[in-house]
Design a protein with these regions (language model features):
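Thiol/selenol-based redox catalytic cores and closely related redox-interacting motifs
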Residues: 33-111
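Local sequence-structure signature of Cys/Sec-based thiol-disulfide redox active-site neighborhoods
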Residues: 1-24, 28-33
């Protein structure tokens, strides 16, 4: 398994995801979304699995400030890559598989 957790340091669900993998002694790589973001290829891979809507955090302040609800889908994608704080976290990848949020039932099937 090649687990990557894309998250935010203050995100409760990201901490729960890290703990879940630690308890099972599964090695993972943590990537801080606000500082590193997702590469365009990583983004496309995750979007293909979970869909665009699942990736966007509609409850964050940046969503309102950038008027995300009122712009075209293409412009939303550009903003999402430009402002990584818009991502829902944690984004957990295992090769080509991906989840958004705390999904231990799905991760257990990866083992």
């Amino acid at each position: 398994m090649n687990i990557q957790i894309f998250g935010k340091k203050k995100c409760f669900d990201t901490k729960k995801a890290e703990r879940w993998f630690k308890e099972r002694r599964i090695k993972y790589q943590y990537i801080d979304v606000p500082s590193k973001g997702l590469s365009p290829r990583e983004y496309q891979s995750v979007k293909q699995k979970v869909g665009f809507e699942a990736l966007v955090n509609t409850k964050c302040r940046a969503y309102e400030e950038l008027h995300m609800a009122y712009i075209t889908p293409d412009a939303q994608e550009e903003k999402l890559l430009e402002y990584p704080e818009l991502f829902n976290t944690p984004i957990v990848r295992n090769g080509k598989e991906a989840t958004v949020g705390y999904c231990p039932d799905v991760w257990a099937k990866w083992e």
